[in-house]
Amino acid sequence: MEEKNQTIVMEFFFLGLTDHLYQKIALFITILFVYLVTLGGNLGMITLIWADPRLHTPMYFFLSHLSFVDMCSSSSIAPKMLCDIFAEEKRISFMGCAAQMWFFGFFVGTECFLLASMAYDRYTAICKPLLYTLLMSQRVCVHLVVGPYVFAIINITTHTTLAFCLPFCGSNTINHFFCDVSPLLSLACADSWVNKVVLFVLSGAIGVFSGLIIIVSYVSILMTIFKIQTADGKQKAFSTCSSHLSAVSILYGTLFFIYVRPSASFSLNINKMISLFYTVVIPMLNPLIYSLRNKEVKGAFRRKVQKKHFPAGR
């Protein structure tokens, strides 16, 4: 009889980040500003890459997809978060929660593998310069971009299916600001041990596999750089890798902290603050990192500005 009286959950409610009005106002303004910069920066990067023939190289082909993924991952979280900040009830439907989890997980997973593809591209450019055009042909580049999307689909579909096959019949309040898998599993009526193991194993496998590709690539790059005789040559080689290393360090450090460490190490409130960083801030940082520290991107931007203000023939 008790089982029949249990209420099946049809929607979820978020606790959000704060209940204080002034903090809500500051949070809304900050997130809105960061989101607009994210959209403008990443869309501008994509437009610049596709409009400038000098940037039609494998490195910028990958970077355009990274910008697309960053823009989409932020858009799967930020608009809903902005709407919820001043809402009395921060609600989301059962299927809406599943969709948000799937799309965000898909784009974040894709980004991890894209960064690995970009590391391999840097390896071939520095360690195998004479074979670069052969090793990084158009066909290879397409495979190195399609692969991350496919692996990410398999990964997040597994997590989302396992999570939403669990019964939710008790509390429907998620201690978070979006449908993340870990706080959602804590609401399940059934034992979610299998889900947590799968989450730990798959997240760890993605991190280890893509991380190993990045580490091996950069160890080989460093060994090659140390063999370069001229200081200018070394500086040029380092400059081509510094932006990518910065992006890798920020994203992987944050994701490992959230998903791979033991779940009891830190409170959900700390997790929420760190999640805010990687859901909203990191997508904004990548175009800034790659544009401010890349001479070719800055050169392409200057050419566009000069062409607009000083068109030929005037």
Swiss-Prot record:
GO terms for biological process: G protein-coupled receptor signaling pathway; sensory perception of smell. GO terms for molecular function: G protein-coupled receptor activity; olfactory receptor activity. It is found in: Cell membrane. The keyword Iron-sulfur does not apply. Residues 47-54, 121-133, 218-237, 293-312 are cytoplasmic. Keywords: Cell membrane, Disulfide bond, G-protein coupled receptor, Glycoprotein, Membrane, Olfaction, Receptor, Sensory transduction, Transducer, Transmembrane, Transmembrane helix. It comes from the Eukaryota. One of its GO terms (cellular component) is membrane. Its main location: membrane. Disulfide bonds join 97-189. The chain crosses the membrane at residues 26-46, 55-75, 100-120, 134-154, 197-217, 238-258, 272-292. It is a multi-pass membrane protein. Glycans are attached at residue 5. The keyword Membrane applies. Residues 1-25, 76-99, 155-196, 259-271 are extracellular. Potential odorant receptor. Belongs to the G-protein coupled receptor 1 family. This is Olfactory receptor 5G29. It comes from Mus musculus. The gene is Or5g29.
